[in-house]
Amino acid sequence: MSDQLDLAARLRALREGNAAPADPETATHTAWPAPQYHPHCRRCIHKSRSSWEGRMPRAAPCAEAEGSYSQVPVWKDSKETRRSYLDDEPTPQPQSLINMANTLVQRQRRINLPAAAYSELPTAAQHRRGASGRQANTATQVLQLTCTWTLARRSSKSAEELGTWMNTVAEEARKAALPPQLKIARTNVPTVEQAWKGRTPPFHDADEFRLMRYTAVATKDPIQFSNDGYVLRVHQLHRRIKVFITITMYNEEGSEILGTLTGLAKGLGYMCKEYGQDFWQEVAVAIVSDGRTKASKTCLEYLNGLGAFDEEIMTVTSLGVDTPAGENQTFENYFPPLQVIYALKENNGGKLNSHLWFFNAFSEQLNPKYTVLVDVGTIPAETSVFRLIRSMERNYQIGGVAGEIAVEAPNYFNPVIAAQHFEYKISNIMDKSLESVFGFISVLPGAFSAYRYEAIRAVKGVGPLPEYFKSLTSTTKELGPFQGNMYLAEDRILCFELLARKHKQWTMHYVKDAIARTDVPETLVDLIKQARRWLNGSFFAGLFAIGTLAVWSQSSHTMSRKLVFTFQFFYLALQNLLSWFLLSNLFLTFYFVLTLAFTDSAPALLQAMLTLYLAIVGGLIVFALGNKPEPRTASFYLFSCLYMGIIMMLVTGISIYGLVGKGTSAVKDPRVITGPLATVLSLKGSLSVVSSPRLGLIFLSAFVHGEFSILLSVIQYFFMLPTFVQFAHLSWGTKGLESGGRHGPTKTGGGKVKEVVEQQKKLEAQRQAAAKEKEDVDNSFRAFRSTLLAVVAHDQRHLALRCDGLHVERVLLEGPQLVVGFFNVIVSRAALYLLSCASLSYSALTAVQWGPPTIPMSATCRPTGRLITMYRTKATVGLWLPVQRA
């Protein structure tokens, strides 16, 4: 009953904000036990103390840990002489040396150590009997120094333990002397024991399996977490953490955190089978919740039932808990213990801020070897985390790895989900596999990836992590519009900084077998929000990486590796250039194919389709300038998606008809043609030669990897494809940078009216200055967005008009087509689709003016050729070979 009253008093005190220092048994910093010595060392120390009692200096007794730092004892020399102790001692006589040597031999035999070397001591002293006493003393001392190394090493170790213990006592005394407002309030709550509902938890003798420890954290800067005296229970138990996993969450439901923790618990069980049953002590999980008011009620209820959270206190928690998994009503199965740190932030700061706490506060204290990033809702397979860690253990040059992210239970009747399923599969099969061969993966997804902590950790404030968190440590005005957009894809910045780290040669790797299933946006509005953020951030991050290519000269990569990186980044530059004109290429594809089909048969329908298409593009520009994608604008986005999808499927059908249909081979101008689809049929011969194998590249690559499910989502992907290439996604701005302010209570006057008024005036002046600065920054971002959209629209229009009225298309397109064939060795999703669109535009334009093209392509097909499968890395490379006209 007294414990319950004590607990209630503590909870009430913490809620009122005036928590008193914890009781001695639950104090923040408990004095460490004195070092334990070996029994023989203890016996030797006792004898030495008794024999040298009058000659050794005495030390002042150690003060208690609750004293101030100035009260920490200092060893003082009480002997009033400037000479050393050895010089003050008389020289022993030879007979006494012999007696001392015999004593050493007997002592050595008693502690069961080899005494062969000690048997030489009496003999050496007998030989020196006729010599002077100092010579005998010197000989004996030399033998003692050379023969007692084992005992000396043990004594040295004991001395180191003693020094560590004294430093700990001094640190505890310093922390105990902190002002009352800085003392750490910590409370143990039997939530874990209550979660077992009367059953005895495993390892119930340890407090970490019975009690949850709550700590109210007042640190504003996460890097000062350890310096302010906060200690995680895992660190207090002196456990060396090898794998540190973070789960970032916002407002997800309890079922999502349940799935993620269950997947990690299964993975921990598998790692315990591989590394040993006690490996769970080297694994810890940190759950960082972004905002107390944003946390889901069902998620908090689940954590409360698990024993990782208590509704009464909103703090950072640290515990060790066994995760039960009830399989049926007759028995229960228990996973290995999972050490969980649940951090609930008071304010919403974003996912990047959650990573800031994980790396700069928790990881900096625990110093793990590997860190794993997981989003809540992502469910790793049983062996996924193990495979990520094993790949870095086998190759010490790998600094980061990424697994395969798959859609959890894709709904093929929902085109939004099915299109993302197809895109994820193709990206994993083609993009990441090939980038892994080069050693640089453009982005390691934050939903499921792992880093070697040594590779990204900052050294004296310099390293990948400070650049990764630059958008949090800098104001929006300091970043500017370019960097503000660039840090929408901070994952890409971290990968580039890891690759180009000075005097290092870190690489990245893709692990195909490490699969994690995640939930994807299910509505069109959510998909557009995600696409805007990803496309915008990747575009500006790509420009940043290309512009800072010279920093590779400071890394320690080999010359051949740097040449490969240069080639890869040159390709990325070309990809960014082509993606700039992606919208105009899509329009030209629709324009030429529809013109070939409907110029003579239905000119009014053709004019209406093209006019409506341009009107939709103009509407998207207006929405991009003024409104965010919200449910109120969902109807317009839905209409544009459906219309562009229908146009895409129509163009695809016309292209397939041109491949399999029968018709004349005559080439005529579509403006004077008679008969629908006549000109399209004229392309049959050239299209069938190149487009058929090109169409099978994606499917053949998928079949090599055993991904047969893409057949069920390919139609939905082509239907949604125009939605992914809306250039209005550019210049979205920044992701919550304007809301990054300092939190905490504000100070007021001491109670006098005059002081209160002055304080309020200062606060009002600060608010006005901050509001004016924010308005100026917003205006600069709006101007940047409007200017960029205007430039993009002008470039798209200019390219479309030039290609429509061009009569020398061989000069314009035959040169780039050779470059396309060269760079098509590297298969990329965005570039491949763009090249397909541009190739069909060239095919249609050449058919109108000059006849069949030299290298025709289809709008719905991607370049192909020989397929080279590298089984070691599971990378598929599409090699495109030009086909010359007969």
UniProtKB/Swiss-Prot annotation:
Looking at the UniProt entry, the stretches that span the membrane are 534-554, 578-598, 605-625, 636-656, 672-692, 695-715
Answer yes or no on keyword Glycosyltransferase. yes
**A GO cellular-component term linked to this record:** plasma membrane
For this protein, the record's SUPFAM superfamilies field holds:
Nucleotide-diphospho-sugar transferases
Topological relation to the membrane, as annotated = Multi-pass membrane protein
Q: Which GO terms describe its biological process?
A: cell wall organization; chitin biosynthetic process
Name of one Pfam family that matches: Chitin_synth_1N
Localization, per the record, is: Cell membrane
UniProt-listed Enzyme Commission number(s): 2.4.1.16
GO molecular function ontology, one term from the record: chitin synthase activity
Report residue spans for region: Disordered.
16-37
User: Reaction catalysed?
Assistant: [(1->4)-N-acetyl-beta-D-glucosaminyl](n) + UDP-N-acetyl-alpha-D-glucosamine = [(1->4)-N-acetyl-beta-D-glucosaminyl](n+1) + UDP + H(+)
Q: If you read the UniProt record, what top EC class would you report for this enzyme, in one word? A: transferase
**InterPro entries on file:** Chitin_synth, Chitin_synth_fun, Chitin_synth_N, Nucleotide-diphossugar_trans
- Name residues in a coiled coil: none
Write out the entry's keywords from A to Z: Cell membrane, Cell wall biogenesis/degradation, Glycosyltransferase, Membrane, Transferase, Transmembrane, Transmembrane helix
Query: What exactly does this protein do?
Result: Plays a major role in cell wall biogenesis.
* Stated family: Belongs to the chitin synthase family.
This protein's name:
Chitin synthase
In which organism is this protein found? Saprolegnia monoica
Name of the gene: CHS
